[in-house]
């Protein structure tokens, strides 16, 4: 860590300046991955999983979810259930049942909300797994009536998904969980592949 003590006022803007990232090459790389996933499906996702995450595209099994449930402390389970309850209460209060208006005799107009049939959720894993994000995304999707909720999250080096992510997914009613991360996972959910 670089320590700077008592810098001159003229140096402040340079000291706090964020590094500039040239995203031109990054955008081209991302678009290339997305195009490859769109055109080659699972084969492309598997290739990028191995290249970027040193992992294999795979779905999470029921046995893995049961194993994860045993690994999560009771304190965290209780917190996840409480958070799910609170998130659900908030979103249930916003549920819209529609409005019907007879604009003139014999003519009725109405407004109706229809859920997206299938949604994809990307949950970062790694050093700071965002298991609360699972609840905040999957819970309203379930309440809205989405029939299928697909979750992608990168596995660790042993090919395992963080147990708290799996526990949150179970509580929130996620339909399918895939061990996939990065652009390739988002592309798989956006375009669909043979397995995702």
Model-derived features: where do they sit?
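Active-site-adjacent beta-strand anchor residues
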Residues: 38, 152, 179
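Short acidic/polar active-site loop segments enriched in Thr and Asp
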Residues: 41, 147, 175
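Positions that flank functional sites
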Residues: 52, 156-157, 184
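Conserved small-residue-rich beta-alpha loop and adjacent elements
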Residues: 101-167
């Amino acid at each position: 860590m670089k320590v700077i003590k008592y810098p001159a006022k003229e140096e402040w803007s340079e000291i706090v300046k964020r590094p500039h990232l040239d995203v031109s090459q990054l955008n081209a790389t991302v678009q290339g991955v997305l195009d490859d996933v769109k055109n080659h499906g699972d084969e492309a996702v598997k290739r990028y999983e191995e290249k970027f995450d040193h992992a294999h595209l795979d779905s999470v099994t029921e046995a893995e979810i049961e194993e994860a449930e045993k690994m999560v402390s009771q304190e965290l389970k209780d917190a996840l259930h409480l958070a799910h309850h609170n998130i659900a209460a908030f979103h249930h209060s916003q549920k819209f049942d529609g409005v019907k208006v007879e604009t003139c005799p014999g003519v009725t107009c109405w407004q109706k909300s229809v859920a997206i049939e299938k949604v994809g959720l990307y949950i970062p894993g790694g050093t700071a797994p965002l298991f609360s994000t699972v609840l905040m995304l999957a819970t309203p999707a379930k309440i809205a009536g989405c029939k299928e909720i697909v979750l992608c999250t990168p596995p660790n080096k042993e090919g395992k998904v963080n147990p708290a992510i799996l526990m949150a997914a179970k509580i929130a009613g996620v339909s399918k969980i895939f061990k996939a991360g990065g652009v390739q996972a988002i592309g798989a959910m956006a375009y669909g592949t043979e397995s995702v």
